[in-house]
A protein has these predicted regions:
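Polar, enzyme-active/binding microenvironments
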Residues: 2-224
Length: 224
């Protein structure tokens, strides 16, 4: 449940909100604790900054996809997870895109969408162009609106797996079609979700893979 919005809170309260064990060692500059409010490393913070913070995202987002008739869509919809009902318009991606990462790359406040099959500035939305992109965009859960540029992947690719621990986001593998190298990737890219910028090399998967799914906890990510 969210941290209280008034009164005294402790570092232990914050640590437990991000999944830490009560009364265990931690620091206010730990990545998972900072990630709860998207604070950068070494930022000047106070406990009041964590008032109302929650490691549970109240909204679910659906970003882009293929709309049929060989056309990608740029629509972002959302639902309020606590209440059953139809999706509501949130905003738009910069262009129609499908085949982005499978697995969320999110913090408590921000959601990223990486790569995919789409367009880098052209007006066309025809999925038959088979053009992979390296674009990474983000939205803030708290306010509806269009996606904003975050940075770029290490290469143009689609069909990656994704995962995050609220502080760091990862993409695994992927595929580049005839537009580029026509091959699978084994590269793992990572982002610090609180800070916009390009992907950094994390390592490699055991094999070059595409169309995998990803999931992550606070300390480990799985690809399957």
């Amino acid at each position: 449940m969210p941290i209280q919005s008034s009164g005294a809170i402790s570092l232990d309260d914050i640590h437990q909100e991000v999944g830490g064990t009560a009364n265990s060692n931690c620091s206010i500059n730990d990545a998972d604790i900072r990630g709860l409010i998207d604070a950068s490393d070494g930022a000047n913070t106070s406990f009041n900054d964590w008032y109302g913070a929650s490691n549970v995202t109240p909204r679910g987002l659906f970003l882009g996809g293929n709309g049929g008739s060989d056309s990608n869509v740029d629509v972002i919809d959302y639902v309020t997870i606590a209440s059953a009902g139809n999706a509501t318009d949130f905003g738009n991606l910069s262009n129609g895109r499908a085949r982005t990462q499978k697995g969320e790359i999110c913090s408590a406040t921000r959601c990223l969408v990486a790569g995919g099959n789409g367009f880098e500035g052209g007006a066309s939305n025809n999925a038959n162009s088979d053009k992979e992109v390296d674009v990474v965009e983000y939205v803030e859960f708290s306010s509806t609106g269009n996606a904003v540029d975050f940075g770029n992947l290490s290469a143009h690719k689609e069909y990656m797996a994704g995962g995050s621990n609220a502080t760091r986001g990862l993409t695994f593998g992927g595929y580049a079609g005839s537009e580029h190298i026509n091959d699978n990737y084994n590269v793992i890219d990572y982002f610090t979700i609180a800070s916009t910028g390009n992907a950094t090399d994390f390592g490699d998967t055991l094999a070059a893979v595409r169309q995998s799914c990803g999931t992550a906890g606070t300390t480990r990510a799985l690809v399957f």
